[in-house]
Each structure stands twice: as C-alpha cells, then as structure tokens.
Amino acid sequence: MAEEVWKALSLLFRIAALGLSLAAAIVMATASQLVIGGGGGHESSSYSVSFGQYNALRYFVAAGAISAVCSAAALYLFAVRADFTVVVVSLPLVPVLDAAAQGFLFSAAGAAFATRDVVGGGTSAGRGSSVCDAAGAFCGRVTVAAAVCAFAAVSVATAALASRDAGGGSSEGRRFEW
C-alpha cells in the first residue's frame, strides 16, 4: 500500500511540474508592456519592453519549454512504463529526465530573478530610475514567471524523491540504484 501512495504522490507532483513549467514559459513569453513617457511638453514618447530584449529571459522561455518536454516524457515513462526498463547508456531514463528538468528549471528561475533585479535597478544600481519604475507590469510578470518556475523545479524534485521511495522490487525499497 505504501508503494501505491508514493507512486500517486510522484504522479501528482509530475503533473504539477508539467503544468507549472508550461505556465511559467507562457507567462514569460507574453511578458511585454508599452511604456508611454512624457517628454516634458506636449510631446510624449513611447517604447515597448519585452522578454525578447533580454537574453536571459529568452533562455527562460526555451528552458521552460525543454523542461516541459522532459517532464512530459518522464510522466509518460513513469505512468505507462511502470517497469522502468527504458535505459539509455545503462542509466534509467526517468531519473535522467528528472535531473534535466530540474537543471533547466532552476537555472531559468535564477536567470529570471537576476534579470529582474538588474532591470529593476537592484540595490547596487545607484540610479534614480529603472525599467521597472516605468514598466511595473512587465517586471511583475517576470517575477511571477520566475516564482512559478521555481515551484515547478521543486515539484520535479519532490516527484523524483517520491518515485525513488516508491519501491519497486529492488533492495531496500529503492527503485533507482545508480
């Protein structure tokens, strides 16, 4: 019975990780804002701020999409191929996919948080204004996407730990003996 509980918990967190990584990539890919600034007189200037202007945020979208693919593949293999006979270069594939998804998600979240701090002026910037002063909604979306991405990474880690404790016939209830 305990093995079924661990497997159900792992499935739950795998589904959550897939949804959260997709949501983070979508929120970041739609992060843009038109900023209208006053020119002092009757003139006004405007410019657009978008995730595509920052390499780290473009990496975020790509990493989120790649981790979603890794999470979907791991979910399929975990749920459908319960015997875990799928191995690549003598390593079980599900833990490799879990590790890849975690790596992409944690690095993407870090890149987004760092970019948000740099774009937002940070504490060490010493400037009077930043992009986030004028485009607060853009920076808000970047922050939300980074937080969702971090939660997705934690979900993948929890799913991996739960699947490891699910048992499955190997010694001491451990499924993946590296």
UniProtKB/Swiss-Prot annotation:
It comes from Sorghum bicolor. NCBIfam families: A_tha_TIGR01569 (TIGR01569). It is a multi-pass membrane protein. The keyword Protein transport does not apply. Its main location: membrane. PANTHER family: CASP-LIKE PROTEIN 1U1 (PTHR36488:SF8). InterPro entries: CASP/CASPL (IPR006459), CASP_dom (IPR006702), CASPL (IPR044173). This is CASP-like protein 1U1. Residues 1-14, 81-85, 163-178 are cytoplasmic. Coiled coil: none annotated.
